[in-house]
Amino acid sequence: MNKENKLNPSLPSGFEDRWGKKLVLKKQLLKVIEKNFIKFGAEPLETPSFEYADNIGSFLAEDEDNPMSDVFSFEDRDKTISLKYDLSSPLARFYAQNNQALPSIYKRYAIQNVFRNEKASNARYREFLQADFDIIGNVNSAQANAELCNLISSTLLDIGLNKDQFTINVSNRKIVQGLINDLKISDDKQLRVIRAIDKLDKPGFGLKGVEDLLKKERKDVSGAVTKGADLTDEQASQILNFLKIKDLKTLKENLKNPLSQEGIKELEDVFEIIGFSSYLSEIKTNFTIVRGLQYYSDFIVETNLNFKVTNIKGKEVDIGSICSGGAYAKLISRFKGVDIPGTGISFGAVSYTHLTLPTNGLV
């Protein structure tokens, strides 16, 4: 091979090799996470890297004209197959296919790679490992969701974090849905509203960024424009006022919609159960947490660090949520035609390798 034809040793954007200490740390973290999954009663599940595209669903991407745009898909004879975007959709397919052989309350954990066909960044990869824990079946929902919160706390404490170093934020999607119903926001705008609210705590957004997304459009620092929900000034103002509420008591006094009140009551039930554990201090209400994926139906959880993280290059980075999830009522009904409730969480294992660097004091 002559000099002009030599290959350039490189990887596609959003993919990386992992070796040496970083890989050792990752494996150590996964042992801690898996130990806690087993302690909380789950059994392992492994599904193929590929699923039929229809199994993954059309509720993923923010591009409403092309909802599967964030999914890597390929034509395989007369079918479209996709690399799995998350571990929840394969779980729904597996449960629908095998539920007769599974216990009535099925707890499973899965630790596998997922793939996202989206813009990569320093802390955002297009292939990464997720570690999921889910509970499916007719279990008491407050009990199941409280168990998820306890599992998150137990795992993070075992990893080496202190209670004051992380916050488990919880909410209920019914709360904001009730407000949306009261404001008579049309169906075609509702998903954009929910995704706008979910951006509040993301870097570079804040109330102004959310307001732009609730109205005509938002232009970011690069000049890229995101289409807004095109709400009226009054509708946008009501939502922004809602986002300023921080506690259940005030929320209960201000939101009278029956669906909102139902969501508030469900959150109160979760806190009542958590009160019997030793983990209550780490768990807070945050009504701006709604999660962008359409399949979430009520309970929502998102866990964030209370300190800045330094990466291997010595640079402070925002790694975002380190564990998130929630309840879903219709994910399995796409296959079974019957609503089978489920709830679950996902740890992003790559994020935790930042935590265990010497600069962050956990090794």
Question: What label would you give each PLM region?
Answer:
Residues 2-3, 22-41, 51-52, 78, ...:
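Positively charged, Gly/Ser-enriched RNA/tRNA-binding surfaces
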Residues 2-23:
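Auxiliary tRNA-acceptor-end handling modules of aminoacyl-tRNA synthetases
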Residues 45, 49-81, 124:
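Polyanion/phosphate-binding surface patch
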Residues 50, 169, 193:
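Residue-level "edge-of-site" marker
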Residues 67-76, 185-206:
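Acidic, His- and aromatic-enriched active-site or binding-groove loops in soluble protein domains
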Residues 169-183, 198-205:
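Short, conserved secondary-structure transition motifs
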Residues 354-363:
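Single conserved hydrophobic/aromatic residue that forms the stacking wall/gate
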